[in-house]
Amino acid sequence: MTEKLQRILSDSKGARWTALFIVAFTMMTGYFITDVMSPLEVLLDKPIADGGLGWTSDDYGFFAGSYGLINVFLLMLFFGGIILDKMGIRFTGIMACGLMVIGVFIKYYGVTGDFGGSRFTLSFVNFSLPMSAAVASLGFAIFGVGCEICGITVSKIITKWFTGHELALAMGIQVALARLGTAGAMMGALPFAKAFGGKVGAPVLLGLVLLVIGFLSFIVYTVMDKKLDKSVEEAKGEKEFEKEKETLDEESDDDFHFRDLKYIFSNPGFWCIC
């Protein structure tokens, strides 16, 4: 049995740390995009004629809050967890990264497009936004769905590769690299924008390029993930492989069923935690 276990790919220190840094880099680019607009408010407030976007503080506040709109009101994190359990790491990760890239494309169009001073208005609630803010908010909301689902996917990936190894250290390094993305956005976004003539879109475009690289990196990871599954299957045999799915495979033995919702919502502990 020891000889078989040594053939599992996650037992290779180089392989599991490579897998970690690949997915951690993807999350780092996501965190960079999340906060890249935060230091740019001084440019957003400028009139359009002066190279800004003409946003007010209220406009920026709505944009910043849009990150969680779809996640909260459409319960996308909840459904994202279900998708992860049902469809597995590779499918969910690629889907999440794809949503992030699409969202940032829309966000970039929102802050660089010429909307001619048009506004998005909902008269029945007396709500109005510059069209640039509305489009950017839509993109940021879509990005937020992908980023949060990617986060829970990365957590499952780390558990899959590092169970029985340096699990806590791996999680700590992943969080540290993610915060490095936040620090890069906070410290570098405004100087980068000023280097390109005060254009708000410049750091967003930089983030988009980094995110695409992160997406491609995750695709590379899926190859490693498939090899890990194959190595586990070969080492354990088909019968034992089925028993290890919960921690070493993307398909958990404890698959989610919609009937489980009854037990979740009827559990007082669930509502206390909420």
Indicate residue ranges for each PLM-predicted region.
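Glycine-rich segments within core transmembrane alpha-helices of 12-TM secondary carriers
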Residues: 168-194
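Juxtamembrane intracellular "pre-TM" segments in multi-pass secondary transporters
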Residues: 2-13, 230-273
